[in-house]
Amino acid sequence: MGKQFDKKITWTIKNFASLLSDLIYSDHFVVGGCKWHLRAYPKGYNNANSLSLFLGVAVPTSLPSGWRRHTKFRLTLVNQLSDKLSQSKLNELEQWFDEKTTNWGLSSMCPLNEIHAKDSGFLLNGELKIVVEIKVLETIGKLDVTEETSTITETVDVNGFQLLPSQAKSVSRMFAKHPELASDLRPKNPNLRTGYMSLLLSLIETLSQLPQQMSKDDLLDAYDALGSMRDAGFKLDWLEKKLYEVSEKKENEEASETGLQEMEEELKDMKQKCLEMEALVEKEKAKVSTAKAPISFDDIV
């Protein structure tokens, strides 16, 4: 059975409550050889009381006359406190996009008072998150861009870091345990911030290995990486403590291995001596048995 959707994109809208624009767009993403984007009306489209949200062809003018895209998609307003409360307003809707219909969606995605309600879960740290899942079922007209040559990368915003979806869960858990982790981080460039976070995840992955899988060079590299991240402003006392524990375990493991090898060699020598001693005992037993044997009449005569 094929995948229900080809791609899943998360759009994070920052400072949603203070947006002044009537219309905002997501970055472009590529599905089925076509550039798409999401467009949102934070104050509502012909409905001032609801968030309006649409999926659209990003650059329709780049497509030839007569182009069409038969598409199935789903829009979800994410509840950041509870997956069960996330609102899926469009469920597997199928729509033909063409020159006359370049956008399709809902003028009333969700009431604004529900979004802004205290502890509703839709706004967290001023951020609103929207997910679109999309599958292109049929294409008429040449492709304007191929999936293979696209440089667009799907990312998810986690506490101001643009990360791969595969990294998001681990980083969210890390911030939940250590909320001050990046409060003093100096680099503001998104690429640098992402690079530092990837380095931090790699370091944690290294420390998660079994002691026998790590070399002394790995530990030296880990200390260098830790120093670099602390210089950048990360608060990593908890990780430094863990690195020390891992280093200590590595030293204990190496010392134990050395001691174990010596004990095994000693045990081997002792076993050999036992075998030799057992042979001597058997030999002496034979002598004793011979000495104790009675002398027969034939032996005397």
Curated annotation (Swiss-Prot):
Listed under GO biological process in this entry are: defense response to virus; response to virus
Q: What happens when the gene is disrupted?
A: Susceptible to systemic infection by tobacco etch virus (TEV) and to some isolates of lettuce mosaic virus (LMV) and plum pox virus (PPV).
Q: Which residues form the MATH domain?
A: 6-134
Q: Which domain of life is it from?
A: Eukaryota
Instruction: Enumerate the UniProt keywords alphabetically.
Output: Coiled coil, Plant defense
> Which PROSITE patterns does the annotation name?
MATH
Concerning Pfam families, the annotation shows:
MATH_2
Family annotation (InterPro entries): MATH-CC_domain_protein (IPR050804), MATH/TRAF_dom (IPR002083), TRAF-like (IPR008974)
Coiled coil segments of this chain: 235-289
Fill in the subunit field for this protein.
Self-interacts. Interacts with RTM1.
Protein function: Required for the restriction of long-distance movement of the pathogenic tobacco etch virus (TEV) without causing a hypersensitive response or inducing systemic acquired resistance.
From the Swiss-Prot or TrEMBL record, give the protein name. Protein RESTRICTED TEV MOVEMENT 3
Q: Which organism is it from?
A: Arabidopsis thaliana (Mouse-ear cress)
The encoding gene: RTM3
